[in-house]
């Protein structure tokens, strides 16, 4: 281990640091070119809307998360903060990154779930109902009662990097240290229509007899009748002059400095080892080349004509150019992980009996138990 490398960013990690965050802007384009259509994710209408409001919402947005600003500008979400976090976190399942974090696997029936795939991370239900629940609960309580994040960093460090909320037990909230989102600016909304025609007219050909009460809609769902799909979501298209797709990412250095251990001093060596380790993981995720094949119809590539912009932002608002290659970030992370000592891999089982006991409790009993845990 190179001590100079592992301590390279200590000025960012000490309590009196003036560094607020690293910020990155990356401009992207559809793989086919700027003038082609891309498909954002679609979402269900909010539950609190009435049926009339839901219909109006679908007509206006087609299910996309798109905002219309004063003056006619539009902003469309292409990949959410949560989706980006899931994509970044997944790199720690593969080489050469997997050795940087403990690999925690929970067996649920015939399925093995890697903690890195759990949407709520250390606070996920797959953890709460596993044989590791007491260990995770103790780690969250260590943060809540003592401000000591080391136990959680030993078992689920990416839950610190990408954030989690232990809402069902201790109530501990960990903000995202790494936050990324992809948005498209100045886009026009498009529609599309489609028609499915079966290879055989099953009813008119006498191949099937339709029982009484079976509607044409049911036949369509079964693939036995024509199925039109008219005026549905057809993607978005960048406007020729101002349209752009941009990934905005932040690495919150202040959030790392808020991490402590059970040592007395705010900047003691044990605490700095923890902060270096978490910073190393964050830098690896922040600088790694990520797959931007987001979904069907939405494959993006970096805009070769607009290089990414990396800056270190100070608390006084000053912006400084910042440069760090992914190889440099990985080397720093490896040295910091060696110094911190990565926690061991864990294999656990989903506790069906415990889950059954919890499900059998009344709503009032669960609320009382939750209050007691907090």
Question: Where does each model-flagged region fall?
Answer:
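Short active-site loop/helix that positions an aromatic residue
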Residues: 84-94
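Basic polyanion-binding and macromolecular-assembly surfaces
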Residues: 1-76, 97, 104, 108-111, ...
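Domain-exit/linker segments immediately C-terminal to small folded modules
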Residues: 115-117, 123
């Amino acid at each position: 281990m190179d001590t100079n490398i592992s301590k390279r960013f200590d000025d960012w990690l000490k309590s009196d640091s003036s560094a607020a965050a690293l910020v990155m802007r990356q401009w992207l384009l559809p793989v086919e070119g700027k003038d082609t259509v891309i498909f954002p994710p679609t979402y269900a209408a909010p539950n609190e809307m009435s049926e009339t409001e839901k219909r109006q919402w679908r007509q206006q947005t087609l299910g996309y998360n798109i905002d219309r600003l004063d003056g006619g500008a539009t902003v469309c979400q292409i990949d959410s903060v949560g989706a980006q976090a899931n994509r970044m976190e997944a790199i720690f399942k593969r080489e050469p990154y997997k050795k940087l974090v403990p690999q925690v696997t929970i067996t649920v029936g015939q399925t093995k779930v890697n903690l890195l795939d759990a949407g709520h991370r250390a606070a996920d239900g797959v953890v709460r109902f596993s044989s590791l629940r007491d260990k995770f609960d103790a780690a969250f309580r260590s943060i809540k009662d003592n401000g000591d994040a080391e136990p959680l960093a030993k078992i689920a460090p990416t839950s610190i990097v990408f954030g989690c909320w232990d809402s069902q037990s201790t109530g501990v909230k960990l903000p995202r240290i790494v936050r990324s989102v992809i948005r498209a600016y100045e886009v026009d909304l498009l529609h599309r229509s489609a028609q499915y025609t079966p290879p055989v007219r099953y009813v008119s050909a006498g191949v099937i007899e339709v029982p009484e009460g079976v509607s044409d809609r049911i036949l369509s769902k079964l693939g036995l009748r024509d199925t039109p799909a008219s005026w549905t979501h057809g993607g978005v298209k960048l406007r020729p002059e101002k349209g752009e797709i941009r990934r905005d990412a932040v690495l919150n250095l202040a959030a790392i400095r808020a991490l402590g251990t059970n040592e007395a001093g705010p900047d003691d060596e044990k605490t700095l080892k923890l902060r270096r380790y978490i910073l190393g993981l964050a830098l690896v995720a922040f600088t790694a080349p990520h797959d931007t094949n987001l979904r069907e119809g939405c494959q993006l590539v970096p805009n070769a004509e607009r290089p990414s912009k990396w800056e270190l932002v100070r608390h006084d608002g000053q912006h400084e150019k910042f440069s760090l290659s992914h190889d440099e970030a990985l080397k720093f992370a490896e040295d910091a992980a060696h110094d911190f000592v990565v926690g061991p891999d864990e294999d656990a089982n989903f506790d069906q009996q415990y889950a059954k006991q919890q499900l059998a409790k009344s709503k009032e009993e669960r609320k009382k138990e939750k209050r007691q845990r907090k």
